């Protein structure tokens, strides 16, 4: 499909897209601040220039836009010039993976939050997951005797034997 804008119109439109202080970033930053976490923004000396840096906990947080970083959400797929955008997004994803690997190799904890995870329906769950992840990091840095095990889907062991279908207590 042909572009309906002149190059000047396209340039003006694209130049207005914000890369900093986006609404999803502000949601995360406000929540972190209210939880008592202090941070720096866009530290140039770190690979990928993370959105949020908590040096005390050696943790960086990237708040990624689903379109620009290729999350794959249905409503964030390009409608025009698809080939260009597909190549651009692949390059962005490769760059993101490279930056995250460099940060992890340097001993940083990397947390990625996607724009769609901060939509009103999922925001609370996402912030709870962030709270859990940061709690684990804080415990690890404070020398907790044993980290919490990762939650998995394996069957749990019950403290009591399973109830019989004929048991009068089960009604």
Features from the language model and the residues they span:
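Nucleic-acid endo/exonuclease domains
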Residues: 1-112, 116-171
